C-alpha cells in the first residue's frame, strides 16, 4: 500500500499517463465502501500488469482509522487523503456527495464510466 498526500496536483500526476484508473471515493466508516475494497483486490491483482490502476481517495478525517481500514481490507493499491472529509477539493471537483463513488478514467484523465461496480466493473476488463 502506498499513501499520498492529496492535492489536485498530486492527483493529476498520479492518474495522467497511466492506463485505465479507477478512482474510488470511500471512507473507513462506510460499510459498502469496505465491501467494495474486498472486491477490488481480486480485480486489481488480475489486471494491474495490463496497466489497470486503482486510486482510492478517502474522505476520512482520522489518519489512523483510514490506514487501519486499508490494512484490514488488504487494499494494496494507491491511496490518497487530505483528511478534510467532505471538504476535500477532489470530492468537490467530482461532485461526490455520497459513498461509495467511483470513476473510471482513461490515460488522459477523462471519465469513461461512473459508479461501475462488481460484475459490471469486472466485465470492462
Language-model features: locations:
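Conserved strand-loop elements at the edges of beta-sheets that form or border functional pockets
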Residues: 5-8, 59, 98
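Hydrophobic beta-strand anchors of alpha/beta hydrolase catalytic cores
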Residues: 22-23, 54, 102
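Short, internal strand/loop/helix patches
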Residues: 67-103, 107-108
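Proteins that catalyze or organize thiol-disulfide redox chemistry
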Residues: 1-23, 28, 38-41, 45, ...
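Structural microenvironment flanking redox-active thiols in thiol-disulfide oxidoreductases
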Residues: 35-73, 86-91
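Conserved beta-strand segments of alpha/beta enzyme cores
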Residues: 2, 53, 76-78
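Active-site-proximal beta-strand/loop segments in catalytic clefts of secreted hydrolases
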Residues: 25, 57-59, 82
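Hydrophobic heptad-repeat coiled-coil signature
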Residues: 30-33
Amino acid at each position: 500500500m502506498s499513501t499520498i498526500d492529496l492535492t489536485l496536483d498530486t492527483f493529476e500526476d498520479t492518474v495522467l499517463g497511466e492506463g485505465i484508473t479507477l478512482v474510488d471515493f470511500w471512507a473507513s466508516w462506510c460499510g459498502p465502501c469496505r465491501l467494495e475494497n474486498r472486491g477490488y483486490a481480486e480485480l486489481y491483482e488480475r489486471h494491474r500488469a495490463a496497466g489497470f490502476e486503482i486510486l482510492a481517495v478517502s474522505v476520512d478525517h482520522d489518519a489512523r482509522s483510514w490506514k487501519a481500514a486499508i490494512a484490514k481490507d488488504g487494499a494494496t493499491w494507491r491511496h490518497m487523503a487530505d483528511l478534510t472529509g467532505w471538504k476535500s477539493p477532489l470530492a468537490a471537483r467530482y461532485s461526490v456527495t455520497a459513498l461509495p463513488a467511483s470513476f473510471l478514467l482513461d490515460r488522459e484523465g477523462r471519465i469513461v464510466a461512473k459508479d461501475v461496480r462488481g460484475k459490471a466493473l469486472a466485465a470492462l476488463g
